[in-house]
């Protein structure tokens, strides 16, 4: 089981400092969509150039022109790129093919997908490396959790790995770990903690059953 740190509300220099502080406890560092919007793909390059031992994910949330956008993210050092599950099948397939051509991976974000089981099966067939159930920020504010969505997706796929994101914190991660996803994505639960290193350490300990 992998652990990903999602960083959204810092600049690229701050994100790189935070990532290096916690890199011993995580597998993947995400340059979140707000950073990409504010600073562009050079933020991905900056992190990639200044960290070792972890993969770098560019959270582009691609919707169209998928092969081009994946190729650009890869050019700037991304190991994993995200596309939206509500994108057209042709876009998903183009993104998968482009990522795999470069030996990289594609994560499909299921935010706003209505029929989770059907779409997850489609994405599994299209070759997605990860399918991520994602309770977005706006729904977290309404008290929603990704647990039920995680169970639904896990029940129907056979090839893709399952990722889960949305409001996960050190004190709630054990409920997620119990569902045995392949990748757990934690954002503010680490990044906004009083002691991010301790928070990351606690998340890793929960994953390892300690």
Curated annotation (Swiss-Prot):
Catalytic activity: D-ribulose 5-phosphate + formaldehyde = D-arabino-hex-3-ulose 6-phosphate
Superkingdom classification of source: Bacteria
Pathway recorded for this protein: One-carbon metabolism; formaldehyde assimilation via RuMP pathway; D-fructose 6-phosphate from D-ribulose 5-phosphate and formaldehyde: step 1/2
Gene3D superfamilies: Aldolase class I
Swiss-Prot/TrEMBL GO biological process terms: 'de novo' pyrimidine nucleobase biosynthetic process; formaldehyde assimilation via ribulose monophosphate cycle; L-ascorbic acid catabolic process; one-carbon metabolic process
UniProt keyword annotations, A-Z: Carbohydrate metabolism, Lyase, One-carbon metabolism
A molecular function (GO) term: 3-dehydro-L-gulonate-6-phosphate decarboxylase activity
EC number: 4.1.2.43
NCBIfam families referenced in this protein's UniProt entry, alphabetically: RuMP_HxlA (TIGR03128)
Similarity-based family: Belongs to the HPS/KGPDC family. HPS subfamily.
Functional description taken from the UniProt entry: Catalyzes the condensation of ribulose 5-phosphate with formaldehyde to form 3-hexulose 6-phosphate.
Name of the protein this chain belongs to: 3-hexulose-6-phosphate synthase 1
Source organism per UniProt: Staphylococcus saprophyticus subsp. saprophyticus (strain ATCC 15305 / DSM 20229 / NCIMB 8711 / NCTC 7292 / S-41)
